Amino acid sequence: MADAYEPYHVLQQSRRDKLRIPSLDSHFHFHPPPPPSSGGGGGVFPLADSDFLAAGGFHSNNNNNHISNPSYSNFMGFLGGPSSSSSTAVAVAGDHSFNAGLSSGDVLVFKPEPLSLSLSSHPRLAYDLVVPGVVNSGFCRSAGEANAAAVTIASRSSGPLGPFTGYASILKGSRFLKPAQMLLDEFCNVGRGIYTDKVIDDDDSSLLFDPTVENLCGVSDGGGGDNGKKKSKLISMLDEVYKRYKQYYEQLQAVMGSFECVAGLGHAAPYANLALKALSKHFKCLKNAITDQLQFSHNNKIQQQQQCGHPMNSENKTDSLRFGGSDSSRGLCSAGQRHGFPDHHAPVWRPHRGLPERAVTVLRAWLFDHFLHPYPTDTDKLMLAKQTGLSRNQVSNWFINARVRVWKPMVEEIHMLETRQSQRSSSSSWRDERTSTTVFPDNSNNNPSSSSAQQRPNNSSPPRRARNDDVHGTNNNNSYVNSGSGGGSAVGFSYGIGSSNVPVMNSSTNGGVSLTLGLHHQIGLPEPFPMTTAQRFGLDGGSGDGGGGYEGQNRQFGRDFIGGSNHQFLHDFVG
């Protein structure tokens, strides 16, 4: 017996022996120990987590022989309980250290074994084996019964259990196989799809094409408020998914091409193909999630519009662009009736109309801060581009349009207002100067301050002739008055008596106008004054008599000229 079972000196040999059931060639002779003092009923081995290895029998005639090994005594304390439904295989081994503590021969050794790591879902029939003839102490009464039990265990445990033979068959029947495969498929599946849904189509190249407007026409209608913002973000995410998938697909294709070019690496291409399938699966899951959210948002919007009483009518929507932004109402119920579409809510596949409101606010502030010179430098354009999130070309184009549409009309209006104001100020100053330089006549003064060079009709002064006759006391016909004002220029009047109607000379109409006196300068007279004019007025005689006559006549003429209809003439000329 000692030759058949060697002690364990090699770890691999120990592991192999634990998993192997040897053939039982020798007979076992079991002698029951004395019954315990408690006198309990028939108990069996506690088959929870231990393996019991039977080796040899007791070759002693004394049935009351007790085991003095403390380890065996401790083991015996577990005996006497009810039988369990599970057990492990029985192996035969020798334990010299245990045999040395006994008085005779081979002993029955019980060695615990670690928990089995088998994933088999089929319980081994040896687990439920109850050896007949087992008494309170758990030992067989006779060698024949023990031998029959060992043969039954060996027959029911048929099949190799080595590390390289039989594991596949055990794992296929394990109840943990399917959950483990599902977990692995969730994280690292490459397209098998045994326990998961079929989410990968036969043609994975469908993800390489951008989403068309027709595919998302039902969800691409602009909505106001948070609903429109959410849909805009989702569409942007969908576009980003397509772009990234294209990028990764091209990179993997390049890697596969490099594998095929190098000799000996042609077998690596299938792994890249599996990676492509996994990539397609993940990106398609993202695409389906985004499209489902878009569809849900679209349906939710339709329901809300129906509740508000505004049916959706996308055909009547017309884009209206205002300078630097968009006119759009943000109300949810009025989203179907508004005439503008928010620029920052526009779908990604449509051209943007205008710029976002935040960017336009920053650009307008800079324009009005630099109104006198609205031409930003390259540094200013880059700074504004960083602040607004726009490109440099967008900032430059906005300022070009702003200078044409906003700045230039404002400058022209300001210039027009300044021109009108200057014209009004110049006209008022000219009137003030005109008023200050014009001298009006005074009726209380003896000498007249102004007179007119207008011809008087011959039949318009019969009463003046009577007054002149009373003053001067003569019957001479006065036709002209020569007034020396000190300037050396002659002043002509058509002043005649209505009875005789003898005109002496007429005033010329081509003379200049004096701004000081308002008189016409007689430059081009037809003929010089006759020398007899002084004699007609009686001025060639005594100075006192002539002066008095001239003064009275001149005073009378001044009063007549200022009064009557000639007053209106002076008022019109000055005013």
From Swiss-Prot:
One of its GO terms (cellular component) is cytosol. Keywords: DNA-binding, Homeobox, Nucleus, Transcription, Transcription regulation. It holds the Pfam family POX. Predominantly expressed in stems, inflorescences and flowers. Residues 174-190 are annotated as: SR/KY domain. It is found in: Nucleus. Residues 223-294 are annotated as: BELL domain. The keyword DNA-binding applies. Residues 24-43, 306-337, 418-485, 533-557 are annotated as: Disordered. InterPro entries: HD (IPR001356), Homeodomain-like_sf (IPR009057), KN_HD (IPR008422), POX_dom (IPR006563), TALE_homeobox (IPR050224). One of its GO terms (biological process) is fruit development. Residues 539-551 have a biased composition (Gly residues). Belongs to the TALE/BELL homeobox family. The SR/KY and BELL domains are responsive for the interaction between the TALE/BELL proteins and the TALE/KNOX proteins. This is BEL1-like homeodomain protein 9. It comes from Arabidopsis thaliana. The lineage of its organism: Eukaryota, Viridiplantae, Streptophyta, Embryophyta, Tracheophyta.
